[in-house]
Each structure stands twice: as C-alpha cells, then as structure tokens.
C-alpha cells in the first residue's frame, strides 16, 4: 500500500464515520428525538467540484495504468461524496434539552435571541456564534418556534 492509498483510506474512514454519526449517532445521543426538520442542502458547487476532481483522478489513474487498489479507493471516495453531498438530507434534530445542527449539540439555554430573516432563514444568536437555519419547507419554521417555546 502506498502513501496515497493510506491517505485515501483515512479519508474514506473519516467520511464514513461522519455519515454514520450524522445519520444514526445524533439520533440516539441526548435522548429521544422529539422533532426532526429537513434542511436545505448547501454547497452544491463545492460538492460538484469535489466529485468532478475525484472522477478526474479515477480517469487519470485508469489511463496511466495505476494501481487497481487506488482506483477502487478513489471510487469508494467518490461514492461516499455522492451520498454525503447529493443523496443524504441534512436535518436538525430537536431533543428535550437541546438540538443537533450541523453535527454540533446546542443547549436551549445558550440561545440568546431568535430572528426570522426576510428570505425565511431562522437566525439563532448563541453565546459566541450565530446559526443560520435554512429549512426545506417554510412551514417548519412555525413548528420549530412552537417547539422551542413549549419546551423551554
């Protein structure tokens, strides 16, 4: 196994670990999920560039008769990228004491202010940062508001 293959294996394991954690780990941490809201997908251009670069690397490796293991690892990385960026639906998961957003846990008592922007983005001001929550369905904003008001 070359250094390139080792780096690819590390990236594949990291992305696979993130996908499993995001899909099933956040579902089980900090108690039962009381409200799950789908979010808009972001970074389409970045994901297209990354997937395209992986495809170019696969083509280059095949054209130059590179190692078969490298081709398979690049293919696995490409499939993981397609799943993470194009198939998986990002979600915000509300629990009894807080919520998961972008893989991070936020307790309700850290929310200092909530505002709704003109374009339908829920802005939550936390102690040290601001969260921009873009929901897929605009009606979900009302569900989020009522859930937070009733559960604090």
Swiss-Prot record:
Subcellular location: Cell inner membrane
GO cellular component: plasma membrane
Keywords of the record: Cell inner membrane, Cell membrane, Membrane, Transmembrane, Transmembrane helix
Superkingdom of the organism of origin: Bacteria
UniProt-listed InterPro entries: DUF986
Annotated membrane topology: Multi-pass membrane protein
Membrane-crossing residue ranges in chain numbering: 1-21, 45-65, 67-87
Xref: Pfam families: DUF986
Transmembrane recorded as keyword: yes
Similarity comment: Belongs to the UPF0266 family.
Protein name per UniProt: UPF0266 membrane protein ESA_01432
Organism: Cronobacter sakazakii (strain ATCC BAA-894)
């Amino acid at each position: 196994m070359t250094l390139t293959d080792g780096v690819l294996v590390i990236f594949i394991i990291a992305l696979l670990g993130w996908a499993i954690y995001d899909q099933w780990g956040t579902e089980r941490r900090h108690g039962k999920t009381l409200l799950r809201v789908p979010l808009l997908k972001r970074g389409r251009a970045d994901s297209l560039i990354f997937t395209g670069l992986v495809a170019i690397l696969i083509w280059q490796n095949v054209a130059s008769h590179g190692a078969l293991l490298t081709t398979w690892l690049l293919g696995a990385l490409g499939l993981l990228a397609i799943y993470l960026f194009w198939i998986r639906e990002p979600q915000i998961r509300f629990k009894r004491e807080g919520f998961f957003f972008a893989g991070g846990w936020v307790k309700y008592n850290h929310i200092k202010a909530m505002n709704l922007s003109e374009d339908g983005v829920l802005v939550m001001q936390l102690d040290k940062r601001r969260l921009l929550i873009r929901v897929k369905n605009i009606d979900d904003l009302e569900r989020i508001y009522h859930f937070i008001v009733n559960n604090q």
